[in-house]
UniProtKB/Swiss-Prot annotation:
NCBIfam families: PRK03987.1-4, PRK03987.1-5. Residues 233-266 are annotated as: Disordered. Gene3D superfamilies: EIF_2_alpha, Nucleic acid-binding proteins, Translation initiation factor 2, subunit 1, domain 2. This is Translation initiation factor 2 subunit alpha. It comes from Haloarcula marismortui (strain ATCC 43049 / DSM 3752 / JCM 8966 / VKM B-1809) (Halobacterium marismortui). The keyword Transferase does not apply. Belongs to the eIF-2-alpha family. PROSITE patterns: S1. Keywords: Initiation factor, Protein biosynthesis, RNA-binding.
Length: 266
């Protein structure tokens, strides 16, 4: 997405060097429509510079810091040397992510999507998530729930969610725990089965969570959870064990959650 306005002083921008002069370099700003900045030779690199071309090349993609903006003069002053390696890598990754989001918008709404509609949808995602990429990632994880506060139509939300789930690689974490279940009742086997169904959530586990319960060795069962972050995963793990324990305890049995396998099983 290219912005139609102007960058702010202090902002980091991505651009391509399209002209090199003795006094500095001109940079086409990739994120701003029709905007070009000037990086004076003193802002290209630290120290004395004999030849600008020893430091940059035409066509090179750079990250620069905006020093000053004069809209009346159509001038943007930039500094390449004021951007450290960490900032550069972070900004380039952010820029690449937004390029991906641009492609996802095209997949979701078609190549013929007009600029006005594109901007309206993009601005809703930006306002809610800070970037289009984060909006698509959240939709991939949480589905429609992620977009409930976004002012978009049902059709637009469905298109975003479907595209996100087909194209966004979501980072997941995995946690494992164990629960010991026992029940002295004559129908104890059936009660344990009921407890395991409860542990698995009875079909009510949120879409962003994958939960599996497997048998280790009586009375121990393994619970494995995959989720977008550790807090969500840990909460789901403990809730799963609690559900199972509650079922057997209601029938005079016992349930105990622990993080490591019992020594007798190893």
């Amino acid at each position: 997405m290219k912005y139609s306005g102007w960058p702010e002083p202090g902002e980091l921008v991505v651009g391509k060097i399209d002209e090199i002069e003795d006094f500095g370099v001109f940079v086409d700003l990739d994120e701003y429509e029709g905007k070009r900045g000037l990086c004076h030779i003193s802002e290209v690199a630290s120290g004395w510079i004999k030849n600008v071309r020893d430091h940059v090349n035409e066509g090179q993609t750079v990250v620069a810091k905006v020093l000053d903006v004069d809209e009346s003069a159509q001038q943007i002053d930039l500094s390449i040397k004021d951007v450290n390696d960490h900032q550069r890598k972070e900004k380039i990754q952010e820029w690449k992510n937004e390029q991906k989001a641009d492609n996802w918008m095209e997949l979701a709404f078609g190549e013929d999507l007009d600029d006005e509609t594109y901007a309206a949808i993009a601005n809703e995602l930006l306002a809610e998530f800070g970037s289009m990429y984060d909006g698509f990632e959240s939709a991939a994880i949480h589905g429609k729930d992620a977009l409930e506060d976004v002012d978009l139509s049902e059709e637009e939300i469905d298109a975003i969610v479907q595209t996100a789930r087909n194209n966004v690689s979501v980072p997941y974490v995995q946690v494992t725990g164990y629960v010991d279940l026992s029940c002295p009742e004559s129908d104890g086997v059936d009660i344990i089965k009921e407890a395991l169904q409860a542990a698995e959530g009875n079909g009510e586990v949120p879409d962003e969570i994958e939960l599996e319960v497997t048998y280790v060795g009586s009375p121990e069962y393994r619970i494995q959870v995959q989720a977008p972050d550790y807090k969500t995963a840990e909460d789901a793990l403990e809730e799963s064990a609690d559900r199972a324990a509650k079922v057997v305890e209601q029938h005079g049995g016992s349930g105990q959650f622990h993080r490591e396998r019992s020594e007798d099983d190893e």
